[in-house]
């Protein structure tokens, strides 16, 4: 049963990929959706056995790589953390597959699309079930490849090509850090197996000298692993690929942002909690990075006009919450928020897809408006998703997002307070852009043509069913799972997560946090909704004043252009590397020094040497006798004096002297 959970999506992908032309669009869609749905049902059974029954399962399949001290096997680990991720991945993926049947029905390449979706799901399942770093890395690279294929699905679009290449290249930076971290683990522990590494993590280790600095070995490994999470989970610095990934079909965006790809970094940190717990330095870095990401993405999303990009930046901001929750050693709350976020984020994307599908692929919110009457079901679904996103009381997002902020406050450290206040301010901006999206899309007077609005229709049944199921999850999952996953006195996570006693603050945040601290997120959410209502629905004078102010125009450009991150990266990093590659690597080295010292220089040297030797053939015997006498004299001299000369004369210097003499003579000529 456990193996079927992982390999059923691979089976569906293989059938759709190899036999899609025979099955057709409908047959491929039914095959892949059925396989992923069965995998989802089996995941529920595994959740009951492993998490609720406290019976972790380990499967060793076969040896993979065995070379001296290096031993990696195909193995699968099913513990509480794994089965929670299995439910998230398979349930969201099955709903996205069902949604795609109708959404992609008119696309001639639908079998290829369904094949890519299933292979994406398979690689994510490989990532979360692997029992060693090598298998995790295989799934890690697999989801990167699948995301490239899905973003690049409409390959005739130039922007889709650029977005796919950007996602691949930016993620390569993080993947390089992850690979170095895995190599560091093997160097330190002589294995890549999770159980062995985590068992030895508490043993004191010597420091390493890295870049002339003495670093703690565990801290260096954890920071390198975190660099991998920065790339995959779109943290500050490597986050620029995530909004551009919206160029793919909307079901792809839902799957990437809700269940796969971006959640891989959070899962990896939670899986490696026994390592990170012994590196306070790495935890501080993670906390600061996550807090800055949540603030950066929230401020960027307030002035975006693309419907899907606004939701994409909300994903980036929520990932910041998950990351800094890991940084304050509350991995269970981070994974709980990951699960809750999957429901309402998939709901938001699928609802946005219904609007875009009906509006003939129009994504600019400024060209919409007045759609609430034409899309009553979609409007209700989008409203539920947005309220859950901002942490409206008693919805799913409320039970995890507010807990993260309370935990950050009760950490009572500089990093904790930094994360709390940036996270709280991010709640304000999150509420603003969530309600701005609702107002501009559904409630303001329409900015579209009347004939376009009259042709619009609400989501068909195959697209509505996944949205309704996700809406139910966005309403009730947080309430139902809170006590089980983060409640006091429940050993739900068992040994899958490790928190040292000195870092355990969950009980303190529950009982010691001041009431005003618990109310701040709700107050900020209300304030953000109030500002969004007045700015986008009521205050026309404010909008005119904003448009005519020079400072406001510059502020608008700053946030709308995403803090100029793309421009800075292009101007100072990408362009510098391109210039170095052409002027230094290509011109100066490849076509310059290397070619002169390499093939061209050697051929020229021997040609000039042959010409010089040929000039010695004068035809006079006494010239030849003199040359032989001179050569014999030099040979005897060097032979007799070799012991004294060899200590300060290198043979290579003699060769360079001979070659340079030819170049000197040729230049004089």
Curated annotation (Swiss-Prot):
GO terms for biological process: ATP synthesis coupled electron transport; electron transport coupled proton transport. It is found in: Mitochondrion inner membrane. Keywords: Electron transport, Membrane, Mitochondrion, Mitochondrion inner membrane, NAD, Respiratory chain, Translocase, Transmembrane, Transmembrane helix, Transport, Ubiquinone. Exons a and b (AtMg00513) and d and e (AtMg00060) are cis-spliced, while trans-splicing reactions are required to link exons b and c (AtMg00665) and c and d. It is an enzyme of class 7 (translocase). This is NADH-ubiquinone oxidoreductase chain 5. It comes from Arabidopsis thaliana (Mouse-ear cress). Core subunit of the mitochondrial membrane respiratory chain NADH dehydrogenase (Complex I) that is believed to belong to the minimal assembly required for catalysis. Complex I functions in the transfer of electrons from NADH to the respiratory chain. The immediate electron acceptor for the enzyme is believed to be ubiquinone. One of its GO terms (cellular component) is plastid. Its EC number is 7.1.1.2. Belongs to the complex I subunit 5 family. It comes from the Eukaryota. One of its GO terms (molecular function) is NADH dehydrogenase (ubiquinone) activity. Complex I is composed of at least 49 different subunits. Pfam families: NADH5_C, Proton_antipo_M, Proton_antipo_N. Disulfide bonds: none annotated. It catalyses: a ubiquinone + NADH + 5 H(+)(in) = a ubiquinol + NAD(+) + 4 H(+)(out).
